[in-house]
Amino acid sequence: MPKYILLSTEPITFKLLLYGQPKLMQEQGWEVLLVSADGREIQQICRAEGVRHEVVPFVKGVNFVEDFISFWRLFTLMRKERPDVIHSYDSKAGFLGMLASNLAGVLHRIHSITEMPTNTKDPKKGLTLREKWTYANATRLWVNSTGMLTYLNTNSGVEASKFELLGSGSTLGVDLEKFNRQALKENHLVAATMRILPGENDFIILAVGQLTKRKGIEELVAAFVKSKIISKSKLVLIGAFEQEKDPISQETIQVIREHPRVVQLDSTDHVAHYLAIADVLVHASHEEGFSNVLLEAAAMQVPIICSNCIGNTSLIKQQKTGLVFPIGEVAVLKEALEFAFVKRDVLTKYAEVLFEEVVDKFDRKKVQQLQLEAYRQLAKYQEKGLP
């Protein structure tokens, strides 16, 4: 039985992003081991997926002592488990995991690039040392979108043969059974509505993600406050502040906390229920590999307004499947919000077109099968002794 290790710094990745994949692989004859830092989700994940889990401590940021301890734990784990395939899903897990597994002799080392490289704003700067080491020690680099693939082939300096795009992109597609209006529980819908407390005819503008500068929260809040529709709308932000990591201005924070037309929630396990209430989803991010929330909104047929960063425009096409505005342009975003309010029938048509595309290309079951087949091919190569 081939052995597969799935590596992430935080266990929440297995619960929210990769759920179902370990179970599917186990059912298809693989021995699966999940590896991450400790967390309260682990027992629930192991029960749901039917797989083992090993704890390796990871710390945020750069800490040479703690990072070396994590590396050594990973190296000894690889030597003990001797997996056929290791697959990492975030930058620190990729950096430490690819290096440790290479030195431990793991033949197939896959890293999923889920975020744009740090040189996106200035390609001449080249990749960071962490990115270079990660890419050098991986045997395959799975990218999230067509736009990301084009960018990396042009600007990374890494041989193009290492980069792979499975299907049309995305880490694991979208669960069309979960993000389905017919499947939502009434009590959760009521609870979501009670937290927002919309007026009878309020236009609900939803944003999901960390409240950081990189996610375009400052522009979104500014555009909303300046818009002509503010008295007839509510802005709902689902995400926590990350002031120590990527701070937004105190002025923006004050608006979020005090404006009667803005609602902020740190987190929720029921994003689908808030999408069901929303009239439009706004994703104003400055950088994106391929946003899962865009797929989730599309599956729920919620109209989308997004920035023109690479990961967004790989899915959303201007005035075909949504509205696209230049990164950081408050005035254009304001106009898009007002257009979405007035031309709801037009936005609905965009959402219908996008829904058909997502069902065809990004159904989680289809994406899972593509990944499973890729792993199977690696296992066959392993049996034949091929690289």
Can you name each region flagged by the protein language model?
Residues 43-47, 234-261, 265:
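Short, structured helix-loop element that forms part of the nucleotide-activated donor/catalytic region
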Residues 9-14, 59-62, 103-125, 138-140, ...:
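A short, histidine- and acid-enriched strand-loop-helix "catalytic/donor-clamping" loop
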Residues 303-306:
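Short hydrophobic beta-strand element within catalytic cores of glycosyltransferases
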Residues 88-94, 113:
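Short His-centered aromatic/hydrophobic patch
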Residues 318-319, 323-330, 339-345:
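Conserved acidic donor-binding segment of nucleotide-sugar-dependent glycosyltransferases
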Residues 267, 286:
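Aromatic "clamp/platform" in nucleotide-sugar-dependent glycosyltransferases that forms part
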Residues 14-20, 203-226, 323, 331:
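A conserved mid-protein helix/loop that constitutes part of the nucleotide-sugar donor-binding site
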Residues 54, 136-188:
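Donor nucleotide-sugar binding/catalytic pocket of nucleotide-sugar-dependent glycosyltransferases
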